[in-house]
Amino acid sequence: MKSVHSSPQNTSHTIMTFYPTMEEFADFNTYVAYMESQGAHQAGLAKVIPPKEWKARQMYDDIEDILIATPLQQVTSGQGGVFTQYHKKKKAMRVGQYRRLANSKKYQTPPHQNFADLEQRYWKSHPGNPPIYGADISGSLFEESTKQWNLGHLGTILDLLEQECGVVIEGVNTPYLYFGMWKTTFAWHTEDMDLYSINYLHFGEPKTWYVVPPEHGQHLERLARELFPDISRGCEAFLRHKVALISPTVLKENGIPFNCMTQEAGEFMVTFPYGYHAGFNHGFNCAEAINFATPRWIDYGKMASQCSCGESTVTFSMDPFVRIVQPESYELWKHRQDLAIVEHTEPRVAESQELSNWRDDIVLRRAALGLRLLPNLTAQCPTQPVSSGHCYNPKGCGTDAVPGSAFQSSAYHTQTQSLTLGMSARVLLPSTGSWGSGRGRGRGQGQGRGCSRGRGHGCCTRELGTEEPTVQPASKRRLLMGTRSRAQGHRPQLPLANDLMTNLSL
């Protein structure tokens, strides 16, 4: 195993790049543990370049008709390297249409000499011409034959959320696709519940990432409260809204340590718990992302604070994680007497016997159901899609997070779309022996936020003087369902334009 490092910006922790062999690439959990043993988590972000013989997908020439149900125009305001961002919903379009739009004269990447030159152009371009992001599309472009690092079934302990509580949250424990163009941006945030995340750039132009080491996350939060006082007064964890852009120059001027890394096609980026990150796309591209967890994350999950205004709430019960991964702390935790202490530099946590037993039990249950022994084939399948804002919890798992934390985590918020079921249809649809397609409708206007009980409250803001709806980023769709019916390896289609165009409410 070998790795290289990026050049740090005012920090002693560097972004490491790893080059696993095919043998090392076979076990996702083991390799993540190795990365942390090398200190990769201390920077908050790491790059993994897969072996040359590995492929996520053989060809990408068959995705032109995938539907982007709710493209989002990203409008920024501000000056001096400090900006806020909001989204305006645009009409649905196919990926082929989006590609042509991204490469048009109006939206194409400007001429530049190198990545550093393009980065300067990016920050100088704000507010400027607002780009359109094809974000938060439920689905996966990984082929079923891809066994290693397939984002649809990584096989981490985040599977406990679905297997023990029957909870599915799109974009958290199911993959999301992101079609980007020049200047499309993800603002400063940490992941929902301070989870890990993994992002694979399938094809296209690069993506630039900024990251603040987890041990300096509170420093960034303090600076953000000073730079955005009006927003911060309305919410204790307003960075969860994913609206704040802060340039590298401003970070340097205020002594905030950070790193920068460019991701190119065919590369993975892994974010670590409580690692604030932001970035932008260099041009037309397609990325896929999902959250995951390791035993080291449990204490972060216990302490993850939540959005206090209700704009962006994604939370779930920590009960199965503490009970199975930290059985020695379970009774204290139930009585709120377990004082978790997060150690940002601790590389890994020993696995409990209960967790080992759980892993063995999953293998036995899959075998009994006649399932293929993939690392994470755990799809729950009610007979009908679950509508946004409604829930069914068969096991009675609570969803209240234990309160009390000095940390202000931020959510990886998403814009709720009309309910187009892509790879999440693997979770939502029964296996019928043929490919399935799901249909449904969201509540529109960015409504249907997930909350601690799975209820959608709905929230929308409208910019004065415009006819198009503007939306604040909403949380990912939360789906609770039975845990008995399982998918049997049949891969449903991503949403196609002909399937859903007539059902859209725009």
UniProtKB/Swiss-Prot annotation:
It catalyses: N(6),N(6),N(6)-trimethyl-L-lysyl(9)-[histone H3] + 2 2-oxoglutarate + 2 O2 = N(6)-methyl-L-lysyl(9)-[histone H3] + 2 formaldehyde + 2 succinate + 2 CO2. 2-oxoglutarate binds at Y133, N199, K207, K242. Its EC number is 1.14.11.66. Its main location: nucleus. Zn(2+) binds at C235, H241, C307, C309. It comes from the Eukaryota. Its cofactor is Fe(2+). Belongs to the JHDM3 histone demethylase family. This is Lysine-specific demethylase 4E. It comes from Homo sapiens. The gene is KDM4E.
